[in-house]
Amino acid sequence: MKEAKRVLVITGAGISTESGVPTFRGPDGYWRNRYYSDLANPAAFAEHPALVWEWYCERRKTVAACKPNDAHTALAEWTRKREGVTLVTQNVDGLHERAGHPDVTALHGSLWRNRCTACGVEREENALDYEELPTSPCCGELERPAIVWFDESIPRDLVVRSVEAVQMADTVLVVGTSGVVMPAAAFVAGARKNGATVIEVNPHISSIPAHIKVCAPATLFLPVILT
């Protein structure tokens, strides 16, 4: 890692599970007998906006009670000390930002942002409850979570930035992702095809095509190799 010039870091749900953030696999994927994919989609919001917002407020409360762990902190401190690092995360919890990471490409959006359903304007939002559904301060129309839902596309500017990092990377550090969620899975494969060395940190089995696989918790391994 010390010899790497251009590093692409890709993080998934696994880096935040050590902070207590649910992964939505198995029982954690259910809320009031509904599976998370039944709520995280445009059709569900159009039909039941109050229900979807209630679920997202519950998610905010859960994440607000969590703290960035040693892996988040190690990545943030390491990135601030050097140039040439791009962090792309599949997570929406905001823990990288809370750890002080200087620049995060959050592919799937953020729990802590609202977006107007009419004009598209986004704003930061920390509310954990709403007495009434949130509306845009710009136009007064209904806001939604600024999250990329099922059946939606990742914003083009985030994809372009990520692809540029893939093309320039000589090293890819993959932390806590199964390797099946697109487009992050394609980023890893593309970087490896371009000649980058892929290092995976994950205590669980994954489909990441890594040159080096470290089967250890990120909170134990990253503070060691990034110092």
Model-found features: residue ranges?
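Conserved catalytic core of sirtuin-type NAD+-dependent deacylases
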Residues: 1-227
